[in-house]
Structure formats: C-alpha cells, structure tokens
Amino acid sequence: MLNLLLGDPNVRKVKKYKPLVTEINLLEEDIEPLSDKDLIAKTAEFRQKLDKVSHSPAAEKELLAELLPEAFAVMREASKRVLGLRHFDVQMIGGMILHDGQIAEMKTGEGKTLVATLPSYLNALSGKGAHVVTVNDYLARRDAEWMGQVHRFLGLSVGLIQQGMSPEERRRNYNCDITYATNSELGFDYLRDNMAAVIEEVVQRPFNYAVIDEVDSILIDEARTPLIISGQVDRPSEKYMRASEVAALLQRSTNTDSEEEPDGDYEVDEKGRNVLLTDQGFINAEQLLGVSDLFDSNDPWAHYIFNAIKAKELFIKDVNYIVRGGEIVIVDEFTGRVMPGRRWSDGLHQAVESKEGVEIQPETQTLASITYQNFFLLYPKLSGMTGTAKTEELEFEKTYKLEVTVVPTNRVSRRRDQPDVVYKTEIGKWRAIAADCAELHAEGRPVLVGTTSVEKSEFLSQLLNEQGIPHNLLNAKPENVEREAEIVAQAGRRGAVTISTNMAGRGTDIILGGNADYMARLKLREYWMPQLVSFEEDGFGIAGVAGLEGGRPAAQGFGSPNGQKPRKTWKASSDIFPAELSTEAEKLLKAAVDLGVKTYGGNSLSELVAEDKIATAAEKAPTDDPVIQKLREAYQQVRKEYEAVTKQEQAEVVELGGLHVIGTERHESRRVDNQLRGRAGRQGDPGSTRFFLSLEDNLLRIFGGDRVAKLMNAFRVEEDMPIESGMLTRSLEGAQKKVETYYYDIRKQVFEYDEVMNNQRRAIYAERRRVLEGRELKEQVIQYGERTMDEIVDAHINVDLPSEEWDLEKLVNKVKQFVYLLEDLEAKQLEDLSPEAIKIFLHEQLRIAYDLKEAQIDQIQPGLMRQAERYFILQQIDTLWREHLQAMEALRESVGLRGYGQKDPLLEYKSEGYELFLEMMTAIRRNVIYSMFMFDPQPQARPQAEVV
C-alpha cells in the first residue's frame, strides 16, 4: 500500500543518482580527447586537492563527493583504453551506491568486477588505501591482474594478498593504494598483527574503505563461523578413539516425535545440529567406558562422547567433509569448495578424524578470534556487491547499518523461471533430472545442474554415465577443483551438461557458445608458462588451471626427475578448445615464447609475474614491451580462431533458448536458490530455470514438519510421477523462511555475544599497539604500579574503622612483595596519614624505586629497560588474554543454562564478562610491575637474550 502511495523506495533511491550520470556523460566529451599522459595527470590533480583537506574527515568526504563525476569519467575512459570495456550508465550508478557505503544488488553478468573499479579508485586517491574483498584467492588474483591494469595505468599502485605470502610481501601489498584480498586473509592478518612481538611484524595499516564482492556470502553465510588463530593443546587421542567406539555401539532413538520416553540411547536435533543422551544412554555409555560418571571432573568423558555422536550422525562424508591424503578437509556448505587448513573447534574435528580412522591431530586452544561481523565493522566506510541481497536487507541494515539498493539491469531479463516439480521420493527426482538432462542435451541446449553436496553430484554423474551423456563435474573433490574455471568457461557451449555443487560465487561468467577469451588465455598459458616459470616457483597457482602430469621427459621442462613431486604443466584438457589452431597461430605462439625466453631467460620468472604478462597481453592497454606485443599478437589470432566457432555456437544456443539451470533441492536460503537461477539469462540472453524437489529433501524433512509427512501419505502416486501443488510450494517457502529466521537468530546471537568480546578486544588490542609502538612505556609501567599501590591500600584499609585499627604492617609487606627495592619502608612512615595521602606517598616511593631499578639495568646495557618493559607487558597481555578467551568461552556455555532459571543469558554474560575483563587487566598490571622489579639480567650474559 505504501509503495502505491509513495512509489517504490528503490526507484526513488536510484533516481537521485541520474543527474550525476548525466554530468559524467557530459564530462566524457572533455575527457575522451585527452592524451594518455593528460589522462594519467588527472590522478595527481585529484590527489593534490585531497592532500589539502586530509586533516579533516568531514572536508575530505565533501571533496570526494565533489570529485566523483570527474573521477568516474576518468576511470570510464581509462577502462575503455586499457580493457576495451566502457562502463554502462547503470554501472556508474552501481559505483555511486558503493561510494556512498551501501550494498549494490546487481544481477549476474552485469559486470560487478568492473563497477568496483569506480569507488576503489575514488577512495584510494586520499592515499589511505582501499580494499577490494573477494571470496577466494583465485578471484582476488584474477581481479588484481585484470582490473589492476586500469588502476596502474592511472598511476595507482595495486597490491594482492595471497595465501603463503611472507610478512614483507604482505606489508608491501597492504601499503599499495588498492589491495585485492580475500576476507579470510584480511581477518587473519588483523589477528596476527595483534599478536606481533615487534612493530616490524605488523603488516596492515589503519583501515579506510572496502568493497566486498559477493557481500552476502561473506557477511551472512560466513558470519556464524568466527576466525580463530589457535595453538596446540595436548589431549590424549585414545579418548577420542574410545569415544568413537562407544558412539558406534549406542543406538539412535526412533520415536523422538511421540509423547513416549525415547527408545534409544540418544536423540538427534538436526535443526539445532545437536545431540542429547537419554537416561538409558548415559547408563550404557558409562558401562561401556567402565566409569561411574561421564561428568567426573578428574576424568571427564561427556565432551568426547557428545562429539563422537555428532561426528556419527551430523557430519557426513562427502557432504560436510572429504577425506584427502589421510586428512579430514571441510567442505563449505554454501560454496561447495573445500577449505584446507580450516578445522572444526572444540574437539569436533578430532572426533571426525577418529570416526574415519585417520591420524588424530592435536586439539587446539584459541589464541585470538574475531567474527566477520565485527571485523568488517572496523572499516570507517564499507560497501558491497552481490546478485542477491534484497532477501537479507533487514539483517544488512540492523547488523552492519548498510542499505541495499537494487541497480537496474543494462538489458531486460529474458529468463523464464518455470514452476517447481515435486516427486514423492528422492530416487524418482534424480531419475527425472537425468531424463531432463538427456532430452536437453539431445536438443543441443547447455544445462547447468546445481547440487547441494559432493555425494549427490556424484550420484547424478553416475546416472548420466549410465545413459552415456557426456558431462563435467564441478565439486569440492580436488581433481575437479583444479579444472574449475575451465569447466565454467565451456558450460555455455552447445549440448554442454555441467553438474556443480553450490554454484554461488563461482566467479566466472557462463557465456553462451563458450568463453573464447578465457580459452585463448588458457592456450597462451600452455605454451608460455612451462618455458618461463622458474622451477622453484610453481607456488600458488590459479585454482582451476593447473594440470599435473608426471610422464613427460624431463628435457621438456616437465616430468618428475629424481622422484620429486610431478611438475606443473599448465596443460588444459584437450576437449576444452573449440577448434584446432592454424599453423599461423602456432607460429605466433612459439615466436612469442622464444622472444620471452630470449628476453627474460628460460624458467626465470615467478608464477605471478608470468601470469601478469599473459593478463596484460590479453587486454588493450598500450605497451612498448616487445614481448607483450608479441604475446598480444598471438593471443588475438588464437581468440579470433576460437571466436569463429563460439560466435556461431552462441547464435545456435540463443535460438534454442539459452542456458537451462536445474536446481535439485531448495537450499536453506532463498538467496542461494536465486544465485543459482541468476546463472541463466545473463545480460539479456534467453534462459530458463526449474527446481526438481522430493518430499524426502532435507529442507522439507527437517523444517516442513508434520504437514509434509501427512502429504506424503496422501499422495498415493508412483515415485516418478511429478506432483504440482500450490500447498506444497507454500509449505516449501514457509520452510525456507523458517530456516532463514532460524539462522538469522543464530547469527544475531553470535554477533551479540561477540559484541561483548569486541569491546574487550578493541581495548586490549589498543593497549598492545601502544606498547608495540613503544610510546611512553616507562610511564605506562609506572601507571600500572600506581594502580597496584592504590589497590593494595584499598584492600588493607577499611575507612569505616579508626586509623589505629588499620593493619599497616600487612599493607607494607604486600607493597614489598611487588617492589622489593622498598625494603626500608616501615609501617610507622604511614601512620597519621589519610588513605589518599598514603597512596600519594607510595606513588612517590614507587617512582624513586623505579628510577633506581632503571639505573641498575641500564648500567648493564643502555636502553635495556625499555626492551624489558615492552617484553613483559606483551608477554602478560598475550598470556592472560589467551586464558581470558577460554574463561569467556566457558562462561558463555554456562550462561546458556541460566535461561532455564528465567535469567537473560546475554545480560549475565555481559556483566560477568566485564568482571572477568577487569580481573584480567588487574592481573596484567600486577604481573608486569612484579616482573619489572624482579628482572635481574646477568652482566656476563648477552643481555638481549633475556628479553627477546
């Protein structure tokens, strides 16, 4: 009703940007004739203006808004010259939304990557840095190489953060004007910086502005999982193994929904991902273990048993994890990608290792942690892009204070979303999907099937193999991950069938007829990389294009001489290329490689540099480099030959109706379903989508409840007969909304609890940073001492009693425990003084004693006292903060139980957590002052060794 009266608020928001777009389009006439030199000079001109107002954030904000039209016009022109891509008007609007610190919802294929160049250029002009955040290393690297060329052309430095980089490389890249990185690298670097022992180890500078690509994936899907840096803790692995054996013998209850007592040893709450032992279960577990109490504090077993049952019932192989190289590797439930190096905490990972019979890794203790919610709120200005944000608009606004604005598409969508079809059983559904794939494949239409787990993608693959239908599989299995970008590049070709696990955020567009540009780059890499990349340096390659081959003769730069690991060949699978190359194209490729070897030397470049040469050659940026010119000539010829085939295929595929997307199960989130749908019909292409569902699907089973069970009995139909029912569809959407609300509540709870930790984290990290930078360390230690003296006085003097009853002797002894240099202090010196006067007197005595201590230490080595101060403060902060994190975790678990006693667990957590924090700060102060006075380096030893 409001929309009818006031008009769509989104339309109003977009409308206010229209005059700016008109202004930019008018400026284009002035900027187009500029020479490259004059265009580049614009950056320096903008920077000069911004330097004058850098002291005032308000003035800087105002000036950036003033510069926006011209800066965007400059970026549009530079992009046209370097990449051959001109920003559409709607992309300009997207850039403005991002500059205003909002979320821009843009459909798949509308060029989000190009949009990000606009606000990142404008916000980097201040010299304070801009971060472009992506979901994985491959996308960060692709965007840094591809879009980075435009920024570099305009005189900005571009940095890239990748896994495995050294601290020096990281610092250099963070100091660039624009830095491309993944959310996890940024978060972990922040935590590591706050564990640094010396200021030189800190790699990040203060945050300024960030654009997050796939913002919903990072700020919502990953918000339930905090980033954790942990250290190892020794726990006996026999307990995990024994618990796993016991869990295997315990029986799951089958009558959990009825009013009767549960019949098994434990109940499983799939919705809450939890397990509960029944009374009989406790008795059986205790008997099997031969113990009298699972909760015995001297020999606790409950934690191990609960985790072992969770591993058995809730953590499924090839769905939640895969086993690779004798290790358990987690599979991300939203992207379907493996997450090597990530481990479940709290002993869960060990329980799964025990279940699978692989080596049990040591359990870990949290050293530092932060949630993505609180990490990204550290940025003064934050923005994001995604194809689907409107469904989570409320959460973005409440948690992050980010508005969502939908950017109009450049061309009208021609995608048809067909109604869902529902089958009675899961097997009936899969057979129908395989039949649909066969039919469409025979017609020549490309098909993309989205599955929710590795296991299901492999089951469908088996069904298609039985029917002899060629297809590509894209899931978390390592052999498939390696070819990810290749598979996506040809998913739009005539008759292609692609099965993908959770397609969201796959980063490469599906182009009808096939992606000639990407295939041409792949061909270039095949020739170029083996001859140019140094042998030590086939380090972290782009996921999806590295092939491994062991059988080539070593003389060709391949093979595995002396039994070493197989060398990378960069060889793509032969069936990806749409055509055989002409002799002319092959000659050009060989000539480019020969010139490269002659110029740089054979196998002499790092992989990053070699990749960068190809990326530059594949664009249009002017270059004087003869090697790039040769490579470009070869690339253009190869692309031309491939395009002759792909353009023809594209016309045929468009005629047939474009890409058809099949969803095989409704995801827990409507947004992920919409992302899958968005793969079809990009940039005005035709396309269609349909979801195939069954009454046995998880979502309906867990959240649909009894209504679905009744429906199942009501439908006395064959398993391969589709059911179309409005009630079913409504039931499904209701289930999805329920799940979304449920997960939103979990994220909200994670956020609220971490908010308590966040205030403490900020305080402790600020204190730590002050110490690292060495600012007034002596004054800080003396303040610690003065606070300690005050606390001793307050603890030993009761102001309600007459002064002759004060135990001054005890007070003086306590002071001497901390400051042994005050051994001459006597109780009678404090007689006749008020508590305040005693405090002032002790402050003076402390300062005298500290100066004396400093003189003693600096005789051994000048400046040693400052080093000792830094060392002891950092040591105490780190040790006690680590213990505090454990105490807060234990507190969080215990307050959860207080909800039963009508108390608000969050309020209890806040107040008790605050008390714990104050206790920790007191302990830090006391331990530091005690350590400083007890510090006694020996002159004959090398003094540094004492403190570093």
Swiss-Prot record:
One of its GO terms (molecular function) is protein-exporting ATPase activity. ATP binds at Q91, G109, E110, G111, K112, T113, D509. It is a peripheral membrane protein. Its EC number is 7.4.2.8. It is an enzyme of class 7 (translocase). Its main location: membrane. It catalyses: ATP + H2O + cellular proteinSide 1 = ADP + phosphate + cellular proteinSide 2. It comes from the Bacteria. GO terms for cellular component: cell envelope Sec protein transport complex; cytosol; plasma membrane-derived thylakoid membrane. Keywords: ATP-binding, Cell inner membrane, Cell membrane, Cytoplasm, Membrane, Nucleotide-binding, Protein transport, Thylakoid, Translocase, Translocation, Transport. Signal peptide: none annotated. It is found in: Cell inner membrane; Cellular thylakoid membrane; Cytoplasm. Monomer and homodimer. Part of the essential Sec protein translocation apparatus which comprises SecA, SecYEG and auxiliary proteins SecDF. Other proteins may also be involved. Belongs to the SecA family. HAMAP family: SecA. This is Protein translocase subunit SecA.
